Amino acid sequence: QLGPPPRPQIPP
């Protein structure tokens, strides 16, 4: 089972 998709990296 695949978990939730990775969240996009938000630059600081």
From Swiss-Prot:
Q: What is its main location?
A: secreted
Compartments reported by the entry: Secreted
- Which GO terms fall under biological process for this protein? regulation of blood pressure
Entry similarity comment: Belongs to the bradykinin-potentiating peptide family.
Known tissue expression: Expressed by the venom gland.
Coiled coil segments of this chain: none
Q: What is this protein called?
A: Bradykinin-potentiating peptide 12b
One example GO MF annotation:
toxin activity
Q: What Gene Ontology terms describe where this protein resides (cellular component)?
A: extracellular region
Q: What does this protein do?
A: Bradykinin-potentiating peptides both inhibits the activity of the angiotensin-converting enzyme (ACE) and enhances the action of bradykinin by inhibiting the peptidases that inactivate it. It acts as an indirect hypotensive agent.
Keywords of the record: Hypotensive agent, Metalloenzyme inhibitor, Metalloprotease inhibitor, Protease inhibitor, Pyrrolidone carboxylic acid, Secreted, Toxin
The answer to whether UniProt assigns keyword Secreted to this entry is yes
Q: Which residues carry this modification: Pyrrolidone carboxylic acid?
A: Q1
